[in-house]
Amino acid sequence: MTEPGQTTHFGYRDVPLQDKQTLVNDVFHSVASRYDLMNDLMSGGMHRLWKDVMITTLNPPRDDQPFRLLDVAGGTGDISFRAAKASGAGFQATVCDINTDMLEVGRQRAVERHLDGQVEFVEGNAEALQFPDKSYDAYTIAFGIRNVPRIDLALKEAHRVLKPGSRFLCLEFSSVDVPGLAKIYDLFSFKVIPQIGRVVTGDAESYQYLVESIRKFPKPADFGEMMREAGFARVNWQVLSGGIVALHSGWRL
């Protein structure tokens, strides 16, 4: 329950905690139709390689063994589609996202890819999932958890819905740790990405928020501690591309 007067960050702004989700929703309503194109432009296509690392780490079964994936904040379906391609006939994914526009893009793409029988799309909140305890074989969230107002609640919910022996994977932007790269990365992030957003989507402000939100996300070690506090074991992370992103892993034992 939100305490009166509680605040959180929305990019570099402090906002009432209860207002953040609405503000985040407005961002993704604005960019949904061009979201995947913008990912390509902003990362120079690197997001595809990072997601490939995530799917390789997930290592879903390639036979007909049943495997249920919960892909949270996965609106356009990119992670679930990649996982389906790497899986066997027993694969089923639930894409859960709070944003209806992102989900609609995902549903259309699932039909186009003939994956609508394996990938379902459900509107839901990462902080209060509607799924039963111990019901999924894996949980993925890619570039989404930093937009959740109460990350601690989302992590506890992730732990709750996973079966014992199942894995949590979170792909998220991180802190550049290569000398010289940080300045270049900051220049590109703050000067170039919002302008790409303005040209492609007509919305520079949403991409300014996304850039700022990356800087406010916890360092890998701090996020790892949050995972442990939520109940995850064998917590670790893999830094990619000089620290631009990190793949976080934990297990429900």
UniProtKB/Swiss-Prot annotation:
<dbReference type="InterPro" id="IPR023576">
    <property type="entry name" value="UbiE/COQ5_MeTrFase_CS"/>
</dbReference>
<dbReference type="GO" id="GO:0032259">
    <property type="term" value="P:methylation"/>
</dbReference>
<dbReference type="GO" id="GO:0009060">
    <property type="term" value="P:aerobic respiration"/>
</dbReference>
<feature type="binding site">
    <location>
        <position position="97"/>
    </location>
    <ligand>
        <name>S-adenosyl-L-methionine</name>
    </ligand>
</feature>
<comment type="function">
    <text>Methyltransferase required for the conversion of demethylmenaquinol (DMKH2) to menaquinol (MKH2) and the conversion of 2-polyprenyl-6-methoxy-1,4-benzoquinol (DDMQH2) to 2-polyprenyl-3-methyl-6-methoxy-1,4-benzoquinol (DMQH2).</text>
</comment>
<keyword id="KW-0831">Ubiquinone biosynthesis</keyword>
<feature type="binding site">
    <location>
        <position position="76"/>
    </location>
    <ligand>
        <name>S-adenosyl-L-methionine</name>
    </ligand>
</feature>
<dbReference type="Pfam" id="PF01209">
    <property type="entry name" value="Ubie_methyltran"/>
</dbReference>
<comment type="pathway">
    <text>Cofactor biosynthesis; ubiquinone biosynthesis.</text>
</comment>
<feature type="binding site">
    <location>
        <begin position="125"/>
        <end position="126"/>
    </location>
    <ligand>
        <name>S-adenosyl-L-methionine</name>
    </ligand>
</feature>
<keyword id="KW-0949">S-adenosyl-L-methionine</keyword>
<comment type="similarity">
    <text>Belongs to the class I-like SAM-binding methyltransferase superfamily. MenG/UbiE family.</text>
</comment>
<protein>
    <recommendedName>
        <fullName>Ubiquinone/menaquinone biosynthesis C-methyltransferase UbiE</fullName>
        <ecNumber>2.1.1.163</ecNumber>
        <ecNumber>2.1.1.201</ecNumber>
    </recommendedName>
</protein>
<dbReference type="InterPro" id="IPR004033">
    <property type="entry name" value="UbiE/COQ5_MeTrFase"/>
</dbReference>
<keyword id="KW-0808">Transferase</keyword>
<dbReference type="GO" id="GO:0009234">
    <property type="term" value="P:menaquinone biosynthetic process"/>
</dbReference>
<dbReference type="InterPro" id="IPR029063">
    <property type="entry name" value="SAM-dependent_MTases_sf"/>
</dbReference>
<comment type="pathway">
    <text>Quinol/quinone metabolism; menaquinone biosynthesis; menaquinol from 1,4-dihydroxy-2-naphthoate: step 2/2.</text>
</comment>
<keyword id="KW-0474">Menaquinone biosynthesis</keyword>
<dbReference type="GO" id="GO:0043770">
    <property type="term" value="F:demethylmenaquinone methyltransferase activity"/>
</dbReference>
<keyword id="KW-0489">Methyltransferase</keyword>
<dbReference type="GO" id="GO:0008425">
    <property type="term" value="F:2-methoxy-6-polyprenyl-1,4-benzoquinol methyltransferase activity"/>
</dbReference>
